[in-house]
Curated annotation (Swiss-Prot):
Role this protein plays: Required for the insertion and/or proper folding and/or complex formation of integral membrane proteins into the membrane. Involved in integration of membrane proteins that insert both dependently and independently of the Sec translocase complex, as well as at least some lipoproteins.
Protein name: Membrane protein insertase YidC 2
Segments traversing the membrane: 65-85, 135-155, 178-198, 207-224, 228-250
Record has Signal as a keyword: yes
Signal peptide: 1-26
Keywords attached to this entry: Cell membrane, Chaperone, Lipoprotein, Membrane, Palmitate, Protein transport, Signal, Transmembrane, Transmembrane helix, Transport
PANTHER family assigned: CYTOCHROME C OXIDASE ASSEMBLY PROTEIN COX18, MITOCHONDRIAL, OXA1
GO cellular component: plasma membrane
NCBIfam families xref list: yidC_oxa1_cterm
Membrane-protein topology: Multi-pass membrane protein
Length: 287
C-alpha cells in the first residue's frame, strides 16, 4: 500500500515537472506580435490581456515595464489568493489528521486486498468528514502553468516589453550575470520550505518537490527571459509572506512538537499502567 502510494506521488510529481517544462517550452505557439487583432482563444483572451495590463501599469509608473510586471504579478497572486488560502488550510487539516490516519494504518495493517481496500475506504471517509482534499496542493501549480506561459508569450510577443531595460539586463533576454535566476531559485526553495514546515513526516512524502523545483527554476531562468525570473521572485516573496500571515508554519511546528510530546507521555503512562496491572495479577497468582 505504502509503496503503491509513493509510486503514485512520484508519478504525480514527474507529471507536474514534465508538464511545467512542456508549458515553458512553448512548442507550437505563435510568435507573431501580439495585438488586439490577434486571433485564436489563447492569443486573444490570455496573452493580449496580459500584455495590455503590463503595458498599462508600465505607463502608469513612468514607462517601466519591470514595474508593470511586478504590479501584475502581485495582482495575479491576489486573485488566486482564495485558492492558496484553501490549499494552506487543507495542508493544516492533513497534518492534524495524521495521528488518525496512523491509527487506521495500524488497525488495517494486513496485506490482503480486502484489508487494503478497507483502509482506503476508511481513509477517504476521514478526508470527506473533515473536508480535506489530498490533491489540493497541486491545484495552484496547475493553475499557474498557463499564467506562466501567458507571461512568457506576452513578453516575447510585445516588442516594447522585450526590448525594455531593467537594472543591468534587457527584460526579453536572459540575465547575463545569472543573478536573477539564482535569486529566483533561492526564493522558490524558501517559499516551498516554509510551506512544508510544521507538517508531519508522512505529509513530507511530497518534500522532494522542494528540491526539484528550485533546480528547474534555476536552469529555466538561465535560458528564458529575465522578466520571467522577475515574475518568479516577486511571486515567491508574496507566497512567503502569505504563508507566514495565514498559516504560520513556526507556530504549527511548535504545536506539532507539543502534540507529539503529549502523545509520547500518554503512551508511557498507558504502558506503565499496563505493567502495574500485569504485576498485580502476577502477585495474586503467586498467593
Amino acid at each position: 500500500m505504502k509503496k503503491k502510494k509513493r509510486f503514485k506521488q512520484k508519478l504525480l510529481i514527474a507529471s507536474l515537472v514534465i508538464g511545467l517544462m512542456a508549458v515553458l517550452s512553448g512548442c507550437g505557439y505563435s510568435t507573431d506580435p501580439i495585438t488586439s487583432e490577434s486571433t485564436g482563444f489563447w492569443s486573444h483572451y490570455i496573452v493580449f490581456p496580459l500584455s495590455w495590463t503590463i503595458t498599462w501599469f508600465s505607463d502608469l509608473f513612468g514607462g517601466s515595464y519591470a514595474v508593470g510586471i511586478i504590479v501584475v504579478t502581485i495582482l495575479i497572486r491576489l486573485l488566486i489568493m482564495p485558492l492558496m488560502i484553501k490549499q494552506l488550510k487543507s495542508q493544516k487539516a492533513m497534518t492534524n489528521l495524521q495521528p488518525k490516519i496512523k491509527e487506521l494504518q495500524e488497525k488495517y495493517s494486513s496485506k490482503d486486498n480486502e484489508t487494503k481496500q478497507k483502509l482506503q475506504q476508511e481513509t477517504m471517509r476521514l478526508y470527506q468528514e473533515n473536508s480535506v482534499n489530498p490533491m489540493m496542493g497541486c491545484l495552484p501549480l496547475l493553475i499557474q502553468m498557463p499564467i506562466l506561459l501567458g507571461f512568457y508569450q506576452a513578453i516575447s510577443r510585445t516588442a516594447e516589453i522585450k526590448t525594455d531595460s531593467f537594472l543591468w539586463m534587457q527584460l526579453g533576454n536572459p540575465d547575463p550575470y545569472y543573478i536573477l535566476p539564482v535569486v529566483a531559485a533561492l526564493t522558490t526553495f524558501l517559499s516551498s520550505k516554509i510551506s512544508m514546515m510544521g507538517q508531519t513526516q508522512q505529509n513530507k512524502s511530497m518534500a522532494m518537490i522542494v528540491y526539484i523545483m528550485p533546480v528547474m527554476i534555476l536552469f529555466m531562468g538561465i535560458t528564458l527571459p529575465s522578466a520571467l525570473a522577475l515574475y518568479w521572485i516577486i511571486g515567491n516573496i508574496f507566497t512567503v509572506f502569505q504563508t507566514l500571515l495565514i498559516n504560520n508554519p513556526f507556530k504549527n511546528k511548535r504545536e506539532q512538537e507539543a502534540l507529539a510530546a503529549a502523545q509520547v507521555a500518554e503512551d508511557r503512562l498507558k504502558k506503565k499502567a499496563a505493567n502495574m496491572k500485569a504485576s498485580k495479577k502476577g502477585g495474586k497468582k503467586r498467593k
